Amino acid sequence: MLFSYLLATLPLLANAALTYKGADISSVFIEEKAGVAYKNLAGETQALEAILTDNGVNSIRQRVWVKNGDYDLTYNVNLAKRVAATGASIYLDLHYSDDWADPKHQTTPDGWSTDDINTLADQIYQYTLSVCNTFAEEKINVEIVSIGNEITSGLLWPLGKTPNYENIARLLHSGAWGVKDSKLATKPKILIHLDNGWDWDQQKYFYDTALGTGLLTSDDFDMIGVSYYPFYNEKATLASLKTSLTNIQTTYGKEVAVVETNWPVKCSSPEFAFPADLKDIPFSVDGQVTFLQRLADTLTATKASGFFYWEPAWTKNAGLGSSCEDNLLVDYNTNQVRSSVKAFGQV
C-alpha cells in the first residue's frame, strides 16, 4: 500500500521542483482597451490574470518601458496591483528603452546620454532605483527584476553595445545596485537575460567576458534568464537547452530559468526547420501541452527554476513575432482560453 502511494505521488514531487510556472501578460491592458474580454474554460468572462492563476500560473512577467505611455511605470504599477491580488509573484522586465529591446534593438531612452558612460551609468542606477522605490511606496512586492531584456548584444546602445564589455559590465552593475539600494523590504532577485538559451557557447562568452572586466561581479546578480524559442533555429533542441542550463549553473552558481518561450497551434510555413527532438510535437493545442511538459521535464532534470510563457493572450498579435501564425493559449476568434492552459497545473 505504501509503495503504491509513493508511486502515485512521484509526479507531484517532480512538479513541485519548478518554482516558477509563469506567463508574460504585458499587453493585457492594451487588449482590454481594444475591447477584448477574456473567457475562461467554462466560457465565462474573467480577468486574464485570474484565468491563468486558476490554471496553475504562479508568477507574472511584466515588461517596463521608460517613456510615458503603454508599458510605462504607471501602466505596470496598475497591472502589478491586479496580479498581486491573485497571489502570483511579480517579475519586472526592465527594457531600459522607450521601445522594444532585444538582440537587434537596444535604443537608449530619450534624454539619456549616448556619449558619456559616467552619465549613463548614473541614469540607469537612478531609473532602476526609482522604479523599485515606486513599487515599495505602493507596497507591492517584487520577486524578480531583470536588468535588461535579451542583452546578448549589449544594452543602451551605442555606449553599451558589444564588443564594449567594460561599458556593458558597468551598466549592469549600476542597474543591479539600483535594485539593491531600493526601499523594497524584500529585495527582488536580480536577473540578467540573454536569448538563445540552448546555445551554451553564446552564454559562456557573454558572462565570461562581462565578469572578466571586473566591473560586474557575481555578487551583483542572482539569476540568469534565457529565451527558448524552438522555431528560430533547428539547433535549439531540448538536449542543447539541457546542456546549456546545466553548464550555466555549474559555471556561475546562479539560479536559472527560461523566461520566454511558446509553442504554435498553427505554423504552416516556418522560416526555420524545427529542432530534431521536437519535430514529433504537433502544431496544435495538444502539442502545446506536450511541449510544455517536455520543457518542464528538462527544467526539472537540470534543477532550473521554471519558465514563463511569453504573451499567451495577445490576440492582436497571434504570431508573436515569429513566422508561425498562432502561438497563443487563447483563441483569438473567441477570446476564450484554450485547454492547453491547464498544462501549467500539470507540469
UniProtKB/Swiss-Prot annotation:
EC number: 3.2.1.89
Localisation per UniProt entry: Secreted
A GO term, aspect molecular function: glucosidase activity
Pfam families cross-referenced by the UniProt entry: Glyco_hydro_53 (PF07745)
Main location: secreted
Gene Ontology cellular-component annotations: extracellular region
Catalytic activity: The enzyme specifically hydrolyzes (1->4)-beta-D-galactosidic linkages in type I arabinogalactans
Signal sequence annotation: 1-16
Gene Ontology biological process terms from the UniProt entry: cell wall organization; pectin catabolic process
Active site: E150 (proton donor), E260 (nucleophile)
Keywords of this entry: Carbohydrate metabolism, Cell wall biogenesis/degradation, Glycosidase, Hydrolase, Polysaccharide degradation, Secreted, Signal
UniProt record similarity statement: Belongs to the glycosyl hydrolase 53 family.
Function: Endogalactanase involved in the degradation of plant cell wall polysaccharides, and more particularly of hairy regions of pectin.
Name of this chain's protein: Probable arabinogalactan endo-beta-1,4-galactanase A
Organism: Aspergillus flavus (strain ATCC 200026 / FGSC A1120 / IAM 13836 / NRRL 3357 / JCM 12722 / SRRC 167)
Lineage of the organism: Eukaryota, Fungi, Dikarya, Ascomycota, Pezizomycotina
